Swiss-Prot record:
Subunit structure: Homodimer.
Protein name per the record: N-acetylmuramic acid 6-phosphate etherase
Residues annotated as catalytic: E83 (proton donor), E114
Gene Ontology BP term (one): amino sugar catabolic process
GO molecular function terms noted in the UniProt entry: carbohydrate derivative binding; carbon-oxygen lyase activity; ether hydrolase activity
Regulation: induction: Induced by MurNAc 6-phosphate that releases the repressor MurR from the DNA. Repressed by MurR in the absence of MurNAc 6-phosphate.
Reactions this protein catalyses: N-acetyl-D-muramate 6-phosphate + H2O = N-acetyl-D-glucosamine 6-phosphate + (R)-lactate
Domain SIS: 55-218
Native species: Escherichia coli O1:K1 / APEC
Pathway participation: Amino-sugar metabolism; 1,6-anhydro-N-acetylmuramate degradation; Amino-sugar metabolism; N-acetylmuramate degradation; Cell wall biogenesis; peptidoglycan recycling
InterPro entries from the UniProt entry: Etherase_MurQ (IPR005488), Glucokinase_regulatory_CS (IPR005486), MURQ/GCKR (IPR040190), SIS_dom (IPR001347), SIS_dom_sf (IPR046348)
Keywords: Carbohydrate metabolism, Lyase
Amino acid sequence: MQLEKMITEGSNAASAEIDRVSTLEMCRIINDEDKTVPLAVERVLPDIAAAIDVIHTQVSGGGRLIYLGAGTSGRLGILDASECPPTYGVKPGLVVGLIAGGEYAIQHAVEGAEDSREGGVNDLKNINLTAQDVVVGIAASGRTPYVIAGLEYARQLGCRTVGISCNPGSAVSSTAEFAITPVVGAEVVTGSSRMKAGTAQKLVLNMLSTGLMIKSGKVFGNLMVDVVATNEKLHVRQVNIVKNATGCNAEQAEAALIACERNCKTAIVMVLKNLDADEAKKCLDQHGGFIRKALEKE
């Protein structure tokens, strides 16, 4: 697909004179365009759901979720991956973000990195990609060689693959087994795909990782019951989670958390089933870490 024919490279009539308007009007134009992004994502919800189910199946069998992208797309993958361990208590490395150009590229532009097909393949080889893993290629344009080559290599290994782009019929979409293509239209600043396209990608990644964690028992109701308390704010959040899940008071919640080394799931089962920490942990282990299943046990 030629660059000039891509939707993400088109000219947006709504912002054609954005350099001549007031600051407030400038913000309104950008905001009006941003409002269209959730609707574009809504149109591809079935594709997102299908990807979540595949990701969950593979991760449940011992695989990993691997994000692969360049520039903004790569940074968004790293952002999503880095939030999973503290939010959901998963081991670092279960969700991985790879960016063309390596760690330096997180904060700096690396010339030619996104054009390196070899880079996409080598980065996957360096993390010992296996057929059990899922590779999610992220590229607003859908034409990034680094991502396309990575997806091709992943499919050769037998991996399940997902392609996220904002141009229908792109190479990323056709290379991946599952295509997620929120079409957000031309950007306010022509070709600046960090804007609407980047926002759409972030919304999709939010759903992929959150959906995986919900289906993996990391959420009870709408509570992040595997959160790791790495600071005072999260210590307080743990107490509130146990309170909200059980109806107990703050003192009871804190006592249960202390008794089980600050594991929210265990504390919740302790309170609701009147068990000690060891009994509650055993009960959870017997039910794959799912609180709801543990509570249904006679």
